[in-house]
Amino acid sequence: MRKAFYTWLMAQRHSTSNKPAALLADLVFEDTTFPKHTDDFETISRYLEEEASFAFNLGQFDQIWEDYLSH
């Protein structure tokens, strides 16, 4: 079983990085309603599109997701 996307994403946090995964990780870290226990693309993508309290380039999310799948 794959680890939750949130768990993987938190390992990408780097306060001095401008990489999209690090930026998303910082935003998600501050978001208390982010779905933390799932590895489902649709659930996370829908959350980012419709419910997140922050804006993020969803084109970059697709590449971050590919990186997550290849870890």
Curated annotation (Swiss-Prot):
InterPro entries per record: UPF0346, YozE_SAM-like, YozE_SAM-like_sf
Pfam families, alphabetized: YozE_SAM_like
Top-level lineage group: Bacteria
Coiled-coil regions listed: none
Family: Belongs to the UPF0346 family.
Name the UniProt record assigns to this protein: UPF0346 protein Sez_1447
Lineage: Bacteria, Bacillati, Bacillota, Bacilli, Lactobacillales
